[in-house]
Amino acid sequence: MIDFEETEFQLRTEKVQKNMFENNVDAILLCTEPEVRYFTGFRSLFWQSPTRPWFVVIPKNGKPIAIIPDIGRDLMARTWIDDIRTWPSPRREDEGISLLVEVLEGAKNIGILMGEEASLRMPLEDFEKLKSKIDGTFSDCSKIIKKVRLIKSEKEILILKNICSVANRSFDRANRLFFSGQPLNEAFREFKITLLEEGAEEVPYLVGGAGRDGYVDVISPPSSKPLENGDILMLDTGSTLKGYFCDFDRNWAIGTASDIAKRAYSKLHKVTELALDEIRPGMTCEEVFKLINNDLGGGSSNIGRMGHGIGIQLTEYPSLMLNDETVLKENMVITIEPSMSYGEGLMMVHEENICIRDGKPELLTKRAAEELPIIR
């Protein structure tokens, strides 16, 4: 089941432990799916159930320790983890707390994710109980974890390239999939099937919109309203391969394209091209945001950011936005996602996935057509 060789997980763990040493952190407690998977290789859709908590502790030295419900023992044993401690769950009176107390014994400064984009995937009541039973105190380890997860290995980048290729091939079939009169929810369904046919393992994220000359919303479930001549259809997919996401979209006109839609598309294509030409290691996320936003004319969208990190999550730290001073470094994988508002409440979004390299970034997605494609 394991998606990488043991050396991949060993390197990730050692990098974090080096950061722990530098910050006087004795142990790190992880309880969220992306972090547990990142450091162990434990990949399962069973996380969809909120009933059972799952824990991994990274000590100062050695391999991580898994403290998990017994139902996950066999799968965890197929990863590189040796120390697996389990309990019969659900068990409301003790959902792994006594085991955590044992593992964390002697740790004075315990890291846990507290920063932006973090969450606590255990009952708050249990967390308070855990704090009362240990001698150590908890501190924010978000920067320690993010510092490692920001930089992708070449093996991770290859998987990201492959899932982008799956979506590329699926988008290339648009002329055979979509047509005037087709209900929007049917278009979504056909595209999801196509993604699976082309090699995606899962399609956990597929959003989009459609409307005359543009769309007004990109996060609602698709309606049964038929596509009409003059509509702009946009689909944005976060499909996965070995648990890694692509995240990009494509736009098409149905039948005919209005001048206003063509102009919006052309503007977004050109500003994306500018970003692809200008982005370099050493730039901050804020600088990239300003580069894109200024070329769009400023204030053209209220979405708040023009891209983000991507990897084992659909959206990862950092964000291409104001006040994000994260410095771009080689092997970071991010999206470039300019958007603009126009007409009577209409909007359009373009998105590509890139890897930061020495010099110009590497485009992981097949570049969108220079002119708005028309499906006839």
Task: Annotate each predicted stretch with a short phrase.
Residues 1-376:
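Active-site neighborhoods and metal-handling regions in enzymes and metal-associated proteins
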